[in-house]
């Protein structure tokens, strides 16, 4: 506590023995011990009161935050909250609408302004969309699955200077890629 070693205690004991005398030394040590005990109890009591005041301050802050949350949510009732949610989500899709394949009228169209702003070109007329969003649903709604149109494969000429590959070599390469 005071960083007093055994040698310092021995010196203090010898000085006390000479100054007080051997007859009164036990009474003096008892009195010093009682004072030390009182000082420790007072320090512990002060520390306990300080910790209690800190806990009360924390509880007051928690109560204040709880009251703010309660005041903010007091205007909301369960019915009011549900109506707000249903209004923001819109009407849910019906099961009959989900089972129907998308038709040309249901497919969303991209305006030329939106296509030029996004930097993408409009899809070709022959290209088929596999998944399309229904016009009545939002982006988070389910997608309708439509049959994919098969396009005729057109032969692509290799660039000049490319090595010649026989048809059998291409077929073997394709089979090897499918196997792995």
UniProtKB/Swiss-Prot annotation:
Positions of region (Disordered): 77-180
GO CC aspect terms: TAT protein transport complex
Gene Ontology MF: a single term: protein transmembrane transporter activity
Comp. bias regions, Low complexity: 105-129
Entry keywords, A to Z: Cell inner membrane, Cell membrane, Membrane, Protein transport, Translocation, Transmembrane, Transmembrane helix, Transport
Domain of life: Bacteria
Keyword match Electron transport: no
Primary location class: membrane
Record field: transmembrane: 1-21
Membrane topology: Single-pass membrane protein
Key word Chaperone present: no
Entry's localization field: Cell inner membrane
Gene3D superfamilies: 1.20.5.3310
GO biological process, one term: protein transport by the Tat complex
Subunit structure: The Tat system comprises two distinct complexes: a TatABC complex, containing multiple copies of TatA, TatB and TatC subunits, and a separate TatA complex, containing only TatA subunits. Substrates initially bind to the TatABC complex, which probably triggers association of the separate TatA complex to form the active translocon.
Family designation: Belongs to the TatB family.
NCBIfam families: tatB
The protein's role, per its UniProt record: Part of the twin-arginine translocation (Tat) system that transports large folded proteins containing a characteristic twin-arginine motif in their signal peptide across membranes. Together with TatC, TatB is part of a receptor directly interacting with Tat signal peptides. TatB may form an oligomeric binding site that transiently accommodates folded Tat precursor proteins before their translocation.
Designated name of the protein: Sec-independent protein translocase protein TatB
Taxonomic path: Bacteria, Pseudomonadati, Pseudomonadota, Alphaproteobacteria, Hyphomicrobiales
Record gene name: tatB
């Amino acid at each position: 506590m005071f960083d007093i070693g055994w040698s310092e205690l021995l010196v203090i004991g010898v000085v006390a023995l000479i100054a007080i005398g051997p007859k009164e030394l036990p009474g003096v040590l008892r009195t010093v011990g009682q004072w030390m005990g009182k000082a420790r109890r007072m320090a512990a009591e002060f520390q306990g009161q300080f910790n209690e005041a800190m806990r009360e301050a924390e509880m007051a802050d928690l109560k204040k935050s709880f009251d703010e949350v309660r005041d903010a949510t007091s205007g909301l009732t369960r019915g009011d909250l549900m109506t707000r949610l249903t209004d923001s989500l819109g009407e849910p899709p019906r099961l009959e609408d989900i089972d129907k394949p998308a038709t040309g009228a249901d497919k969303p169209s991209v305006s030329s302004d939106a296509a030029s702003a996004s930097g993408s070109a409009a899809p070709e007329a022959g290209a088929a969309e596999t998944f399309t969003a229904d016009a009545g649903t939002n982006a988070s709604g389910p997608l309708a699955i439509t049959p994919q149109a098969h396009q005729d494969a057109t032969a692509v000429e290799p660039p000049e200077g490319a090595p010649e590959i026989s048809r059998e070599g291409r077929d073997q390469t394709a089979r090897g890629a499918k196997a792995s």
